[in-house]
Design a protein with these regions (language model features):
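N-terminal binding-site loop/beta-alpha segment at the start of enzyme catalytic domains
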Residues: 1-96
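Beta/alpha (TIM)-barrel catalytic core signal, keyed to glycine-rich beta->alpha loops juxtaposed to Asp/Glu
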Residues: 3-14, 148-333
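Hydrophobic faces of well-ordered beta-strands that scaffold small-molecule active sites
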Residues: 30-34, 64-66, 96-100, 139-141, ...
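Alpha-helix N-cap and loop-to-helix initiation/capping positions
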Residues: 44-48, 76, 80, 111-119, ...
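Structural motif
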Residues: 55, 59, 130-131, 164, ...
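Active-site groove signature of glycoside hydrolases
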Residues: 128-148
Length: 333
């Protein structure tokens, strides 16, 4: 990484990135966005984080997705982004679309989690300070809170927009009935619910099965997919066993029990199809999501610049023949 002043690539908007409209709004988002859930915390190299963020923006990624608890440790991904915002991205602030969220465990006590007015307001104030920002482009309710009146959560989102702390709001991982109420409430209060963010990949089809994709579209909202590679399962990482440095080997979110023999055989067959298409399994998995007309953007993580570059190759072929789609369906039955 050079210590020289960062200058964004002149061809960043002509290097192959596709920009898609978020629902019925005026906002265009890159087909691939960069998420900072892991690999950007205080346990990671600031220099490597800077290189990845620079590479992303230089290649047309304008949307950076964060949350208050991203790291590890919680809050450190926003601090990392804030440092890079100050040293590199400040001249380009108006070209960036920055999101953050609140709703998961963040600090001790009864006000450090879920969807109360107190938690959401305090959390966003903390996030803005960590990221060296006056406002975020979109602020999400990170998860539905069954214990807080939904109207309280939603009115807080409305007030956050009116206070100028966020330009837009969104919801993440809301069940369909709660999402229906959220869309209606926000519309009645003249605030755009710009995006629904949900887990969606070849192995998890809930947004289709539960009607979440269609519901978002009918309410004028875009859909952003996270975990598009199923935390690494939809890559070549596990085709020949479990590497010692993999997420499964380390434990945590992805358990060894998740990779059953049946699932492994499905992944192997998907990999063969990807090879026939001239793609890696990861590229095909991203391309499959991007082929869906109701998907606005797909959020990828990145442990390295090389991994991010590989993910961007998915944009080179997002077309699937009817036969290929049928083959995928047959594999995953």
């Amino acid at each position: 990484m050079s210590d020289s002043v960062y200058q964004a690539a002149n061809n960043r908007y002509t290097c192959g990135m596709d920009y898609r409209r978020a629902g019925k709004s005026s906002i265009l988002l890159p087909a691939i966005s960069l998420g900072l859930w892991h690999n950007f915390g205080d346990v990671d190299s600031l220099a490597r984080s800077k290189d990845k963020l620079h590479y992303a923006f230089d290649h047309g990624i304008t949307h950076f997705d964060l949350a208050n608890n991203y790291g590890p440790s919680a809050g450190s991904a926003e601090e990392t982004f804030g440092k890079i915002m100050k040293t590199s991205f400040a001249p380009y602030r108006d070209e960036l679309f920055v999101s953050t969220k609140a709703g998961h465990d963040m600090w001790p006590g009864p006000y450090g989690t879920w969807g109360s007015r107190k938690h959401l307001t305090a959390s966003l104030n903390q996030s803005l300070k960590r990221m060296n920002l006056d406002y975020v482009d979109i602020f999400y309710s990170h998860r539905y809170d069954p214990e807080t009146p939904l109207e309280e959560t939603l009115q807080t989102l409305v007030d956050i927009v009116r206070q100028g702390k966020a330009l837009y709001v969104g919801i993440s991982k809301y069940p369909p009935e709660a999402a229906r109420k959220a869309y209606a409430y926000l519309k009645d209060h003249d605030v755009i619910c710009l995006l629904y963010q949900g887990r969606y990949n070849l192995l998890n089809r809930e947004p289709e099965e539960q009607g979440i994709l269609q519901q978002a579209a009918e309410n004028g909202s875009g859909f952003v997919a996270f975990s598009p590679l199923a935390q690494g399962l939809l890559t070549n990482r596990y085709l020949k066993g479990i590497p010692e440095d993999s997420r499964i080997a380390r434990g945590g979110f992805l358990k060894k029990e998740a990779l059953t023999e049946d699932l492994l055989q499905k992944i192997i067959r998907l990999d063969r199809l990807a090879c026939e298409r001239g793609q890696s399994l990861a590229e095909m998995s991203l391309a499959w999501l991007l082929a869906h007309p109701l998907v606005t953007s797909v959020i990828v993580g990145a442990s390295s610049v090389e991994q991010l570059a590989d993910n961007l190759k998915a944009l080179e072929n997002i077309s699937f023949s009817q036969e290929e789609q049928q083959t995928i369906q047959a594999i995953l039955q």
